[in-house]
Amino acid sequence: MLKSASGALANVLKRSLVPAARVTAVVPLRRSHGGPVESDEEFDSRYEAFFNRKDIDGWEIRK
């Protein structure tokens, strides 16, 4: 009985003295690089030009 009481007391003291580990969440955030802003039409034309190339292979498409 003394052994279990001293074990319980040790656990209580350990929890009160050792701070609990805090887990911080990683929040996905995309930051602008300050570069030139591309319009939707420019992006679409660049995207279509990439996939309409004659020398494109399966690896580049999967990337």
From Swiss-Prot:
InterPro entries referenced in this protein's UniProt entry, alphabetically: Cyt_c_oxidase_su5A/6, Cyt_c_oxidase_su5A/6_sf
Gene3D superfamilies cross-referenced by the UniProt entry: Cytochrome c oxidase, subunit Va/VI
Protein topology in the membrane: Peripheral membrane protein
Single annotated GO MF: metal ion binding
Pathway assigned in UniProt: Energy metabolism; oxidative phosphorylation
Entry keyword annotation includes Mitochondrion: yes
Keywords: Heme, Iron, Membrane, Metal-binding, Mitochondrion, Mitochondrion inner membrane, Transit peptide
GO biological process: mitochondrial electron transport, cytochrome c to oxygen
Subcellular location: Mitochondrion inner membrane
Primary location recorded for the protein, binned into one broad class: mitochondrion
Listed GO CC annotations: mitochondrial inner membrane; respiratory chain complex IV
Subunit structure: Component of the cytochrome c oxidase (complex IV, CIV), a multisubunit enzyme composed of a catalytic core of 3 subunits and several supernumerary subunits. The complex exists as a monomer or a dimer and forms supercomplexes (SCs) in the inner mitochondrial membrane with ubiquinol-cytochrome c oxidoreductase (cytochrome b-c1 complex, complex III, CIII).
Function: Component of the cytochrome c oxidase, the last enzyme in the mitochondrial electron transport chain which drives oxidative phosphorylation. The respiratory chain contains 3 multisubunit complexes succinate dehydrogenase (complex II, CII), ubiquinol-cytochrome c oxidoreductase (cytochrome b-c1 complex, complex III, CIII) and cytochrome c oxidase (complex IV, CIV), that cooperate to transfer electrons derived from NADH and succinate to molecular oxygen, creating an electrochemical gradient over the inner membrane that drives transmembrane transport and the ATP synthase.
Protein name: Cytochrome c oxidase subunit 5A, mitochondrial
Organism expressing this protein natively: Manduca sexta
Gene of this entry: COVA
